[in-house]
Amino acid sequence: IRDRNYIAALSKTVGLIGVIAVFAITSVMGQSDSKGLMDMRWKDVAVKMPEAWYASDEAKLMAENVLLTQKAIGGWEKNKPYHHPIDASTKAAYLKSKDKIGATFDNDATITELRFLANVYSKTKDERYKKAFDRGVDYILEAQYDNGGWPQFYPVRKGSVAYSGHITFNDDAMVNIMRFLKELLSDDPAFQSMQLSDSKKAKIQEAYDKGIACFLKTQIVVKGEPTAWCAQHDSVSLAPAKARSYELPSFSGSESVGIVLMLMEIENPSDEVKASINGAVKWFEEHSVGRLRIDTQTMPDGSKDRIVVEDKNAPLHWGRFYDLETEKIYFCDRDGIKKDSITEIGHERRNGYSWFTRAPEQMLEKYPEWKKRNGIN
């Protein structure tokens, strides 16, 4: 009943089918039965449902929301639950803001919606989905800088959030774009169904190649050796750049990993790509902050606080940020002042940000196999 009520509400919003027809729909997936679509994350609904589900009336109704919310320029806003019903006032607001800045690649936005449209189109052949998909791909190509990088938002925002115009590796924004472009040229059935023209495929390949070149150009070089990357780089100078007040120019212990993993996927890598990977791996091998346990303790007033404990049985950790001069881990409050210890910053930032990461583990685990595959001793 819950899912039927959900479908009826969504149907009323977009006007696709009548209430009688909607109530005739039965649940098509065990995941929906056990958890309910409303309780799922949009990104999971978009790409992780059983293949047959994308032909369902539920999927078609959600596709109406995705069509409605696409910006005129071709992208989408972030953190929107497009699998939830959209009421009349919210629908009106979306229509009114079609031309406003807000389309982004942050938090998997735009890429998630395009994957969903491809999944639904492959099952329904509704040409509206293909048209929206094509506009979205064109948006990605338009947003790319001549140097191969992508901003977090396009068009770029102004004022205090102008950092969204930097080439953005933060939260794997550019890596996600690059992976999507690579998949567009693959044998994936959903993307094959879009029947991209040869000219469009050529543009996608060119954008991907420029993106790889951008990764190589932005890698921080220390004493002639390639090391890691910053979470964002200036779109003109390519230098490490500042984002929010506590996200200073630095070596990134997290975002660098996604870049290296993507470079490792390149077949027959060039000497420059090999040097990039080798340099990054060496840097991470030398910059672990040790075996740590990140605990949360309850304070006398009932609040929670994060503490870091050295533990020889715990996994290796790396810092989120490393100083560009000293290459030592640092922490930072909203005042933008670097601190040597997490205990030196305020409770809000100490507990509201990920200051440590284990992301390099995956890269280091894949490195021996990558060397063997490419004949590197």
Regions found by a protein language model. Give the residues of each.
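Terminal, non-catalytic domain-edge segments
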Residues: 32-62, 179, 183-210, 236-243, ...
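N-terminal carbohydrate-binding/catalytic regions of secreted carbohydrate-active enzymes
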Residues: 56, 60-111
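Long, well-ordered core segments of solenoidal/helical folds
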Residues: 62-74, 132-149, 205-224, 276-293
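A cross-kingdom feature marking solvent-exposed beta-strand/loop segments within repeated
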Residues: 82, 86-105, 149-169, 190, ...
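Conserved small/polar residues in nucleotide/adenosyl-binding loops
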Residues: 1-3
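Long, hydrophobic/aromatic-enriched structural stretches that serve as scaffold segments
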Residues: 94-124, 132, 139
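Residue-level signature of the C-terminal ends
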Residues: 69, 120, 143, 184-187, ...
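Bacterial N-terminal signal peptides
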Residues: 14-26
